[in-house]
């Protein structure tokens, strides 16, 4: 492509939420070879509302543009799968944006959890809540499962896989149409383990991540999704281990690097498998079904 042959800067347009847009622009300054522009772009970073994603991404891919999209990529698994297939056909990069996946501490704790350091994993429990948003008007606002679900689901799907045997979704809605969940809890059952997420925009809880094993557990304090520190704890506290890692730009910086490298090389440098992206979109879809238990 022109980009690879000339080694010129990747020209990106950033669209959507002002707060995240500014954050992304600031972090892009630390990445060589990326330039934020307003016209004539090679790629887009999308932080628009989830219901807009499918049409926007589809249009951009058809135009031959690369897309980094804040998760969820689509509101259904079918749409998400279709977009990845279209990206492949168009020889474009489509990457899901969950910045936590690119933080050094998070990558390290995944490796340690998978290595058997805490024995066999029997449970993964993630909580993400925030009450920043003014919810007087719900128009163009991300509901709890869209805003926090992908982040909370990430360690579950990366550690236990996507082949759960059952799930139970419990939500509290704050609108008459039952489209905006103020609080959602999802329990997953796997053949030999369990998992749960709690996400909320109208409730507050400790935003921690706990990975339970047969020998010990990994504890990541709040806010775990911006972690630079975690502990492995055992029955004997003298054996406990602490891990500290520098967190540069909440993971956004490394996310941009991975996106740029994927485009330059034609290889996939995303830390999130497309199967996981599809599984996340399936959960977003399931939260709109009649099987949700309402509280």
Positions of the model-derived regions?
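N-terminal Rossmann-like dinucleotide-binding module
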Residues: 1-28, 293
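Conserved acidic residues
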Residues: 11, 42, 122
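C-terminal helix-rich "cap/oligomerization" subdomain common to oxidoreductases
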Residues: 22-25, 29-32, 43-46, 258-295
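Beta-loop-alpha module in the N-terminal Rossmann-like domain of NAD(P)-dependent dehydrogenases
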Residues: 26-86
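Hydrophobic residues in well-ordered beta-strands that form the structural core
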Residues: 69, 94-96, 220
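A contiguous active-site-proximal alpha/beta segment in oxidoreductase catalytic domains
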Residues: 74-134
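Rossmann-like dinucleotide-binding domain that binds NAD(P)(H)
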Residues: 135-205, 210, 275-278
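NAD(P)-dinucleotide binding in Rossmann-like oxidoreductases
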Residues: 175-177, 181, 190-257, 261, ...
């Amino acid at each position: 492509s022109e980009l690879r042959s000339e080694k010129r800067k990747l020209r990106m347009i950033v669209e959507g939420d002002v707060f995240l847009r500014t954050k992304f622009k600031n972090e892009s300054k630390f990445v060589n070879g990326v330039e934020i522009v307003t016209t004539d772009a090679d790629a887009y970073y999308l932080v628009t509302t989830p219901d807009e994603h499918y049409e926007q991404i589809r249009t951009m891919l058809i135009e031959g543009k690369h897309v980094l999209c804040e998760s969820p990529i689509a509101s259904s698994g079918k749409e998400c799968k279709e977009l990845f297939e279209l990206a492949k056909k168009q020889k474009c990069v489509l990457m899901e944006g969950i910045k936590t996946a690119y933080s050094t501490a998070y990558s390290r704790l995944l490796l340690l959890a998978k290595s058997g350091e805490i024995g066999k994993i029997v449970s993964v429990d993630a909580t993400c809540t925030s009450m920043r948003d003014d919810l007087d008007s719900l128009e163009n606002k991300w509901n709890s499962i869209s805003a926090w679900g992908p982040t909370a689901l990430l360690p579950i799907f990366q550690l236990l896989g996507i082949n759960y045997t059952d799930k139970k979704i419990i939500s509290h809605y704050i609108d008459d149409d039952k489209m905006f969940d103020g609080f959602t809890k999802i329990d997953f059952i796997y053949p030999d383990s369990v998992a749960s997420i709690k996400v909320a925009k109208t409730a507050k809880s400790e935003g921690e991540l706990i990975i339970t094993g047969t020998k010990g557990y990994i504890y990541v304090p709040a806010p775990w999704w911006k972690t630079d520190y975690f502990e492995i704890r055992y029955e004997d506290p003298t054996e406990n281990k602490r891990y500290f890692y520098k967190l540069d730009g909440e993971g956004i910086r490394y996310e941009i690097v991975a996106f740029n490298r994927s485009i330059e090389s034609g290889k996939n440098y995303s830390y999130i498998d497309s199967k996981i992206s599809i599984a996340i979109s399936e959960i977003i879809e399931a939260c709109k079904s009649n099987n949700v238990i309402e509280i």
